[in-house]
Amino acid sequence: MPRMVRCSFCGREIEPGTGIMYVKNDGSILWFCSRKCYKNYLLLRRDPRKLKWTLKYGSQTK
């Protein structure tokens, strides 16, 4: 049974068989639900807590 994973950028759940899996050189795996999340995280280096369209918007870890 495939498991649901969460997008590493926006926090939304990704259906099995969809999305982008990115493996870093250190072996950690990043999942992205769309090309939009992929570009914002890896290419533009944006913080998901500062973008209103993400589920992580406004959450501060203290």
From Swiss-Prot:
<dbReference type="InterPro" id="IPR023442">
    <property type="entry name" value="Ribosomal_eL24_CS"/>
</dbReference>
<comment type="function">
    <text>Binds to the 23S rRNA.</text>
</comment>
<dbReference type="GO" id="GO:0008270">
    <property type="term" value="F:zinc ion binding"/>
</dbReference>
<dbReference type="InterPro" id="IPR056366">
    <property type="entry name" value="Ribosomal_eL24"/>
</dbReference>
<feature type="binding site">
    <location>
        <position position="10"/>
    </location>
    <ligand>
        <name>Zn(2+)</name>
    </ligand>
</feature>
<keyword id="KW-0687">Ribonucleoprotein</keyword>
<keyword id="KW-0863">Zinc-finger</keyword>
<dbReference type="GO" id="GO:0006412">
    <property type="term" value="P:translation"/>
</dbReference>
<dbReference type="GO" id="GO:0005840">
    <property type="term" value="C:ribosome"/>
</dbReference>
<dbReference type="GO" id="GO:0003735">
    <property type="term" value="F:structural constituent of ribosome"/>
</dbReference>
<dbReference type="InterPro" id="IPR011017">
    <property type="entry name" value="TRASH_dom"/>
</dbReference>
<dbReference type="Pfam" id="PF01246">
    <property type="entry name" value="Ribosomal_L24e"/>
</dbReference>
<dbReference type="InterPro" id="IPR000988">
    <property type="entry name" value="Ribosomal_eL24-rel_N"/>
</dbReference>
<keyword id="KW-0479">Metal-binding</keyword>
<keyword id="KW-0689">Ribosomal protein</keyword>
<keyword id="KW-0699">rRNA-binding</keyword>
<feature type="binding site">
    <location>
        <position position="37"/>
    </location>
    <ligand>
        <name>Zn(2+)</name>
    </ligand>
</feature>
<keyword id="KW-0862">Zinc</keyword>
<dbReference type="GO" id="GO:1990904">
    <property type="term" value="C:ribonucleoprotein complex"/>
</dbReference>
<dbReference type="InterPro" id="IPR055345">
    <property type="entry name" value="Ribosomal_eL24-rel_arc"/>
</dbReference>
<dbReference type="InterPro" id="IPR038630">
    <property type="entry name" value="L24e/L24_sf"/>
</dbReference>
<feature type="zinc finger region" description="C4-type">
    <location>
        <begin position="7"/>
        <end position="37"/>
    </location>
</feature>
<keyword id="KW-0694">RNA-binding</keyword>
<comment type="similarity">
    <text>Belongs to the eukaryotic ribosomal protein eL24 family.</text>
</comment>
<dbReference type="GO" id="GO:0019843">
    <property type="term" value="F:rRNA binding"/>
</dbReference>
<protein>
    <recommendedName>
        <fullName>Large ribosomal subunit protein eL24</fullName>
    </recommendedName>
</protein>
<feature type="binding site">
    <location>
        <position position="7"/>
    </location>
    <ligand>
        <name>Zn(2+)</name>
    </ligand>
</feature>
<comment type="subunit">
    <text>Part of the 50S ribosomal subunit. Forms a cluster with proteins L3 and L14.</text>
</comment>
<feature type="binding site">
    <location>
        <position position="33"/>
    </location>
    <ligand>
        <name>Zn(2+)</name>
    </ligand>
</feature>
